[in-house]
Amino acid sequence: MATVVVNPPSSLQWSGNITDIIFFGVTDHINLRIDVDDVAVEQLLLYAYNGTAKLEELSDLVEQYMLDNSKYFSNVKIYEFADEDPSSTTLLCQFNVLFCSLTVATTPAAFSQDNFLSTAHVKQFHPGMREKLYFYDPDAGTQNYVAPTLRLQVGYMDGNTMRVATVDDASSLINDCIVFSLSDIMTLASVDNVVTITLTLGARQMLYYVSDFKADSVFMFRNAFNVEENLPLNCTTSVKQVGERTVAQIKRHTVLASVEHETDYEVETAPLSPDQVLLVEQLCESLETYIWFSVFKPITISSRTCEFSDERAKEVTAKFTWRYLDGRRAYKFEALPDDEIFTEEYDPNYD
């Protein structure tokens, strides 16, 4: 009797919600091979009970592969192979997986049709950087599929008047994901003094506020959907240094044996919006985090103290501590502004 999958997974699953798979028609045992994106990640043998065998904890295996390979979307195939010939396989089932480390009260298809791969709908835009905005289209590849057009709406200041410019087709910004800088937006919309940017792709929409001031710190991390996301924060950063020198006594001389030092950066944010609260949570839990310092430098967040409240009237802030992964402090050697440079001719005569 051929092996039958009793409860085949739906075509698109959240990575953390892959159901246990039951196989029927198993005489004694079944040999399985699990492929993710056509890469064999596991081979296992399951013994049968009353003709059935159960494959459990598949979510952990798939999520670990996606994390290790920076994937937000993967295809999973489960094969059966014979004892005497492992190369002879039979495909039992296959399905697609969308990564999400959160529990979402909707299907991945419904969510991805209405949302970008971010928990935020309103964000602060950092003018000095390129923004990446990821999306997944569950209908892509289906028959008669028509890709939605990216629409751009820009709010800008014309003197003291707020005006709006619209670009009906901004698809030039799409390259696997939506990538843009402030100069790209100004060129497309043919405007200056941009204060808001609204991107619409089908039912998905993201609003950016462009501030005149630079954010105190800009972080990048892999968010709940395992894609890169920028997070500019207005915050106060305190530097804490701990150093220890070890000395050794050689005959009558004391010599320096080793020098150890640690530098931690304690961050206290300004009041956060509800969208920023969710992003800070993901930043502190992310396995891959960076801070902007001319380039993105890898860091690790060693501790955090965050008290979040559902009460909107209460200001919500967060505190966390990070350090550079390579242990090297970063410095900026910037030129002084013109009004701070001493330009008077030197007079050697002392009055």
Where are these regions (language model features)?
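Extracellular/virion structural assembly segments
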Residues: 2-7, 11-20, 134, 138-139, ...
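Preference for solvent-exposed, low-hydrophobicity sequence contexts
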Residues: 1-215
